[in-house]
């Protein structure tokens, strides 16, 4: 596990929502894990899940007392990005503002580099 300054940001809006969800679950050990998988209409897609574990090699980013966890393989695609949260007409969701993405699908859930 490394806790260093990495060029990946965890927005205040995302941290606030994670904090609220953790409180609902009544499990302060939970962390938000962001990861990249193959798939989607553009080649790669983002995934978000809650995880109690931080694996060897994972990078952690802390904001407002909550932790974002990223595995080393996913981190290489997320450098310079911002993990954020929005609520709007399309619903509420976590998303990544990713400067490495050369194309994205219409909903923003998948991308290519």
From Swiss-Prot:
It comes from the Bacteria. SUPFAM superfamilies: HesB-like domain (SSF89360). PROSITE patterns: HESB (PS01152). GO terms for molecular function: 2 iron, 2 sulfur cluster binding; 4 iron, 4 sulfur cluster binding; iron ion binding. Binds 1 iron-sulfur cluster per subunit. Coiled coil: none annotated. Keywords: Iron, Iron-sulfur, Metal-binding. Gene3D superfamilies: HesB-like domain (2.60.300.12). One of its GO terms (biological process) is iron-sulfur cluster assembly. Its cofactor is iron-sulfur cluster. Required for insertion of 4Fe-4S clusters for at least IspG. PANTHER family: IRON-SULFUR CLUSTER ASSEMBLY 2 HOMOLOG, MITOCHONDRIAL. Homodimer. This is Iron-sulfur cluster insertion protein ErpA. It comes from Vibrio campbellii (strain ATCC BAA-1116).
């Amino acid at each position: 596990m490394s806790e260093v300054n990495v060029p990946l940001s965890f927005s205040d809006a995302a941290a606030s929502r994670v904090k609220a969800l953790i409180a609902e679950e009544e499990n302060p050990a939970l962390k938000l894990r962001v990861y990249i998988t193959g798939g989607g209409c553009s080649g790669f897609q983002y995934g978000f899940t809650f995880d109690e574990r931080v694996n060897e090699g994972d990078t952690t980013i802390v904001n407002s007392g909550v932790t974002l966890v990223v595995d080393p393989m996913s981190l290489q695609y997320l450098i310079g990005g911002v993990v954020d949260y929005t609520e709007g007409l399309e619903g509420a969701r976590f998303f990544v503002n990713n400067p490495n993405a050369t194309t994205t699908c219409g909903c923003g859930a998948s991308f290519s580099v």
